[in-house]
Amino acid sequence: MKILFVAAEGAPFSKTGGLGDVIGALPKSLVKAGHEVAVILPYYDMVEAKFGNQIEDVLHFEVSVGWRRQYCGIKKTVLNGVTFYFIDNQYYFFRGHVYGDFDDGERFAFFQLAAIEAMERIDFIPDLLHVHDYHTAMIPFLLKEKYCWIQAYEDIETVLTIHNLEFQGQFSEGMLGDLFGVGLERYADGTLRWNNCLNWMKAGILYANRVSTVSPSYAHEIMTSQFGCNLDQILKMESGKVSGIVNGIDADLYNPQTDALLDYHFNQEDLSGKAKNKAKLQERVGLPVRADVPLVGIVSRLTRQKGFDVVVESLHHILQEDVQIVLLGTGDPAFEGAFSWFAQIYPDKLSANITFDVKLAQEIYAACDLFLMPSRFEPCGLSQMMAMRYGTLPLVHEVGGLRDTVRAFNPIEGSGTGFSFDNLSPYWLNWTFQTALDLYRNHPDIWRNLQKQAMESDFSWDTACKSYLDLYHSLVN
């Protein structure tokens, strides 16, 4: 099968979050499974700076963006068997960052038009075209409404993956003519209109042959008013083509037996290296080096969406326990300030590292006993899977991908891979925290069994790849 991915970011070239991880990992797994895979990404200035000497020029042409003719260069490199093509236009993509400009609508309108017109020119007409989030969600619409006259594109099947429904691409309807060069008919009849705006995500949901999300629970949640971001009715209407597939993690990169960022390696049969990493981490972040105290890790953006309003409200109570917490992350200044204040009040119990450090993050995943992740909503989440890979038990709010990946501790059977609570409130966070602390202190054999189950969980991309192939084969024989 010939599969083409079109996305706004992709590791290792450009990455701001989970979308970049997916584009870096899933195509590689599909190639291993015997498929021909290509990816189209914008050619950002950070790609030029880091990978420019590895990328070759292929061709260039002009793209009509409304009444304008814009330069479009095509560049190319091959990595892990995947051919990466880059859309080059320095005006649109040399901004020092991926997102956040006032003209993001124009930037990604150009990108989508260029990606479609590039397919013939690079001689890669896919059987299946996989687009991601709102930045590329107009492509299924454009294929059916603007480029339907191109015979080579007639049989292309499309899949839209929603990584985060909050970001929908809502713009003025004038963009249809001014940028995409199409009429207003589909806006006037309501197909593309939502809240009196042009909504790119709605267009993708309606025009793609299949819609996927990054976990089965999130696929269900976005059809409810609580999580649907005002598109729940549209998703319910199209529910027959909506499914959820849990993202994977790179099992080779996140491997406690070989991780180059760790001082000591270990496996599920011998956790002595984990204990040494714990002592090393305690020393590094300025906490008393104690093997007996439960060490809780947090690696996250400090935002309300991640549940840190509830954590801050609970923190004074939690820190009355004989416990240590090491936090790494940045975000809302109010939360940054709160954690910094608590770290001053409880210097032997809380280390607040208001920054981001890849090595420290990896040490937290590997060295801690518990990993706190009480997200208000979480489409998939990768941190809980990374933590489990290293025998660090997650304590999570049961939403989205957290519900699908963390098996809550069952005291009757002594089974599970972590701890969870259903109601995001200080009471239930504290109650679940106490359950975990009691198990850690009084039932070490059960705790050790949970660690083993967590480390044996299969979150590899090869497993996720099989689910995506089942989805693709439902469209392409």
UniProtKB/Swiss-Prot annotation:
InterPro entries in the record: Glyco_trans_1, GS/SS, Starch_synth_cat_dom
Domain of life, source organism: Bacteria
GO molecular function: alpha-1,4-glucan glucosyltransferase (ADP-glucose donor) activity; alpha-1,4-glucan glucosyltransferase (UDP-glucose donor) activity
Keyword vocabulary terms for this entry: Glycogen biosynthesis, Glycosyltransferase, Transferase
Binding site for ADP-alpha-D-glucose: 15
Reaction it catalyzes: [(1->4)-alpha-D-glucosyl](n) + ADP-alpha-D-glucose = [(1->4)-alpha-D-glucosyl](n+1) + ADP + H(+)
Pfam families named in the record: Glyco_transf_5, Glycos_transf_1
Its EC number(s): 2.4.1.21
GO biological process: glycogen biosynthetic process
Pathway: Glycan biosynthesis; glycogen biosynthesis
Record keyword Protease present: no
Enzyme class: transferase
UniProt family annotation: Belongs to the glycosyltransferase 1 family. Bacterial/plant glycogen synthase subfamily.
HAMAP family per the UniProt record, alphabetical: Glycogen_synth
UniProt-recorded name of the protein: Glycogen synthase
Organism name: Streptococcus pneumoniae (strain JJA)
